[in-house]
Amino acid sequence: GQILFISDFSDLNGNEKVISRALSSEEKRGNLIRLANGVYLRPKNTRFGVVYPSVDEMVNAIARRDRAKVQPCGVTALNILGLSTQVPTKYTYLTSGSSRKLKLGNRLVELKRSVPKNFAFKTALGALLMQALKSLGEKNISKQEIEQIHKLVSEETQKEAFKQDLSLMPIWMRKLITNIFNTLNL
């Protein structure tokens, strides 16, 4: 489906209340699904029902609308990287925008304002790994998690950019990932 915002229709020179009412009536007709205040979904229907976008897709759409950057953190980052099978009950993201809590459909999302350094990574893997490892903690990384990190690093296509990302990480993370790089013979 497609995520729509009231602001997407501002070029129609319409009053925001009029646009909101029009979207609301489309929702009542079943043409749209309201995900949150001012956030709608034009549903994609399959024989199994409505296909909803992932939380990540919804959060990134909201970030684009707000001209903010977002970065998954905590259990959300662990889950995305496959370092945890635990599905978050609350999805947590760092943001360059304002802190807030959102309810997107039946999912809870927390956006936490963060420092620019967290958005300076050149690769998505570098940024996600730092947040995931921070969540685990230096002393709590299992052999299985190291094997998954090894797999992720070996599959990274932008290895030089990823190596540059290491300088943004704490020393203990740098050492861990450098050891993994050394086993890859790069």
Predicted feature descriptions by range:
Residues 1, 56-65, 85-99, 125-130, ...:
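A short, terminal or domain-edge coil/loop segment
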Residues 114-186:
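Hydrophobic alpha-helical interaction segments
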Residues 35-38, 66-104:
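Short gly/ser-rich loop at a beta-strand->alpha-helix junction or flexible surface loop bordering the NTP-binding
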Residues 19, 73-74, 125:
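Amphipathic alpha-helical interface surfaces
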Residues 1-62:
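Short beta-edge/loop segments at beta->alpha junctions of small alpha/beta modules
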Residues 51, 62-69, 73, 121:
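Alpha-helix N-cap/loop-to-helix boundary motif
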Residues 103-113:
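A short, charged helix-loop
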